[in-house]
UniProtKB/Swiss-Prot annotation:
InterPro entries: CBS_dom, CBS_dom_sf, FAD-bd_PCMH-like_sf, FAD-bd_PCMH_sub2, Ion_transp-like_CBS, Transptr-assoc_dom. Residues 80-142, 145-202 form the CBS domain. The keyword Cell membrane does not apply. It is not know if this bacteria is hemolytic. One of its GO terms (cellular component) is plasma membrane. Belongs to the UPF0053 family. Hemolysin C subfamily. SMART domains: CorC_HlyC. One of its GO terms (molecular function) is flavin adenine dinucleotide binding. This is Possible hemolysin C. Gene3D superfamilies: 3.30.465.10, CBS-domain. CDD domains: CBS_pair_CorC_HlyC_assoc.
Length: 301
């Protein structure tokens, strides 16, 4: 079972308190406006009309306010994890297989469960429920641990989704296309990051600004969501056919494996290319290491 030191717990608590303080400070004039106004405009109209002294705001406060203003027009399609990057577990798996797949030593919290194909997501399992089941030595299938998710269209506004998640008391939305198939995934964390900015933890590995770094003549580190075309241009090799449904390096990996790729999984993409999964969550690939057996041309390094 994972344990955090008191120092780490205290640091995380302080970070959370600072974030809460920033949000409360930023929203206090908005609350006062609603208290004194009988017929307020819509939320974004209120923010735009408020006489907020920008000069007295911290950088974090300015960023949050800017993100809120931009949120008005954003839809699920703008932020969702695409289908090709989703990693999920079959309903027929047992608890032992699930615990092995999500690597309990890495503190991910939720994993999707599907029946038959990814177009039939039946819900998700929270890691604390899995810990409890393993601690009490429960056996069998996953059905009794599954929590509900919600369904949403790509065109739904993010604020509408946030309100729906709150009403339904769930943290995961499956995005469906016009035919009812799974198009993508959005979590409550994705929505929060749209407001407060990206939230990294100690397990996130940082890359350069393009999330694609050539380490040496034979090694590349890449974010799994980098488009395959970027890799093709670097190595001078065609990896994606016109009829392929994936666009990203993560999608390329997922088309070559029959089971959930966990950290350490290695896949031969071609005679020249081997890809190793170096960072992943139960729902998506995050980072890969690309090994080139023939190496790169000197002008590409």
């Amino acid at each position: 079972m994972l344990k955090s030191s008191k120092k780490e717990d205290s640091s995380k608590k302080n970070q959370n308190n600072n974030l809460i303080f920033t949000v409360r400070k930023l929203f206090s004039p908005i609350k006062n406006f609603f208290r004194t106004t009988k017929t307020p405009d819509n939320f974004f109209g209120v923010i735009k009309r408020l006489k907020i002294n920008i000069q007295k705001m911290t950088l974090d406060e300015r960023n949050i306010l800017a993100n809120l203003l931009e949120l008005e027009d954003k839809t699920i399609e703008d932020i969702m994890v695409p289908r090709s990057d989703i990693v999920a577990i079959k309903l027929t798996a047992n608890l032992a297989e699930l615990s092995e797949s999500i690597k309990l030593e890495v503190p991910h919290t939720r994993t999707l469960i599907y029946d038959g194909t990814l177009d039939n997501v039946v819900g998700f399992i929270h890691i604390k429920d899995l810990f409890k089941a393993l601690a009490t030595k429960q056996n069998g299938r996953l059905k009794k641990l599954i929590r509900k998710h919600i369904i949403a269209a790509p065109s739904m506004k993010l604020l509408d989704l946030l309100a729906k998640m709150r009403r339904e008391r769930t943290h995961i939305a499956i995005v469906v296309d016009e035919y009812g198939g799974t198009d993508g995934l959005v979590t409550i964390e994705d929505l929060i990051e749209e407001i407060v900015g990206r939230i990294d933890d100690e397990h996130d590995q940082q890359l350069d600004s393009d999330n694609f770094k050539v380490i040496n003549n034979s090694t590349i580190i890449s974010n799994a969501r980098v488009e395959v075309e970027v890799l093709e241009e670097i190595i001078g090799e065609k990896l994606k056919n016109d009829d392929d449904e994936f666009d990203t390096i993560g999608g390329l990996v997922l088309t070559r494996v029959s089971s959930v790729p966990v950290i350490g999984t290695r896949i031969d993409i071609s005679e020249n290319i081997e890809i190793e999964v170096t960072d992943a969550t139960p729902r998506s690939l995050k980072q890969v290491k690309i090994r080139l057996k023939n190496g790169l041309h000197s002008d590409k390094i």
